[in-house]
Amino acid sequence: MIICFILIMFFQSLLNFEELTTEIPLSVDYIPASEVLLYKTSKSITLTRVEGQIIGKLPLTVNQFEQVNNSVAVAIDSIFYFINENGGFVYRWHNDELERIDNSYGHRSQMMSSIFTYEKKIYRHGGYGFFDARNFFTFFDIESNEWEVEIIDEQILPLGSFDSKFFVVENYFYKIGGETIDPFDRTKSYPLKDVWRFNLKDKTWEHLLDFDYFETLTFSKNDFVMNNKFYFTNQNQLYAFNLENNTFEQIENFPLIEKLVKNYPIFSKDANLFYFTSSSNEEKQISVNKHSKAGNFKVERQISTHDNTSLIIWIVGFLTVILIAFNFLNKKRKKEKKIIFVKSNSINLGKKKIEIDVI
C-alpha cells in the first residue's frame, strides 16, 4: 500500500506532453509572474500549472503561428504577451483572442536581445542588427502600446552585446557574457567576458568583474536563479554566480544534467527545483520533474575570475628585470675593483692599499 502511494505521488510530479497534445512542443516558457508553464506548438498555445493542470488553451491558425513562433512569452497582470525576438511586434493573448497591439514596425535590429518585465513594463536590452550590437534599453509601455528608449545619465556603459546570460533580482538587471561585434570587421563577433549590473530604479550601470575562466557564456533556458545565486551549465558542469560576493562557483553536478532538455526551462518554486528531462528510448517521452532539495547544491570550489597565465608572465618579467639589474650592478662593482686610485700618500686597488712615503 505504501509503495503504491509513493508511486502515485511520483507520477503526479511528472507531466507527459502526450496529455497536452500529440505534438512535441516547439518551445516551453516558465512565466514566474503567473507561476505557469506555456507550451507552444504549431497548432496551439497551452497554459498549465506547474503541477500539470491545464488552465487555458488557444488554437492557432497558420498565420497566428507564424506571428508567435519566434517570440518570447511574458505576463503582466495575468495577461500574456508575445514579444518578437527580432524586434518590434507585440501580440497579446486575452479573452481567448490573439491580437497585435504595438504601434511600431517590424525590424531585425534587436535579435538575441535580453527580454524581461519590470514594474508592468516590458524591457529588452542589447541585441544584434545591421552589423552592430546595441548597448541600450528599450521598453514597451502597455498604456500607450509604444516602444520607447530608456534615457539614462552620462556614465560608463558596457559594450553593445547580444545573446547574453541575464536575470533580474529585485531592482537589478544582471548581464553576464554574451557576444559583441568586432569594430574593425563587423562581419565577425567575439565573446564578452564581463559581468554588469543595472539598477532599474536609479538607471545606473555597475561593472562587477571580468573573467577569463570561461571561454564563452551565452543565453540558455537552462539558466535559473535560486537562493541568491544564478546557476548555469557549461560543458556539462554546473556553476553558479554568487550575488552576495560576486564570485563564480563550481557546483557538485546535478545527477541528471546530461538528460536535461536544453531548450526547455529550469526554474525554482516553493523551495523546489523543476526541470525537464527526455527519455533516450522515445523522443516523445519528455517530462517535467521536481527536485525537492533545492537548497542542497554544494560548492566544490570558487572559480578564479582571471587566467593565471597573465600573472605568471608578470612574475617572470619582474624577476627578469631584477636579474638584469643585479647582473649590471655586479659587473659595475667588479669593474670598480680593477681601477687603481693614486692618492698623495697611497695607491689603492680595491680593498688593497700601498702606503707611499714622501722623501
Task: Describe each model-derived feature in a short phrase.
Residues 90, 135-145, 188-203, 238-245, ...:
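Beta-propeller blade signature
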Residues 335-359:
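Solvent-exposed, low-complexity, intrinsically disordered
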Residues 20-40, 63-83, 90, 104-125, ...:
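Conserved short beta-strand element of beta-propeller blades
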Residues 204-221, 247-270, 301-309:
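Conserved blade-ending motifs and adjacent loop-strand segments that build the rim/top face
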Residues 1-29, 121-123, 305-338:
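Bacterial Sec-dependent N-terminal signal peptides
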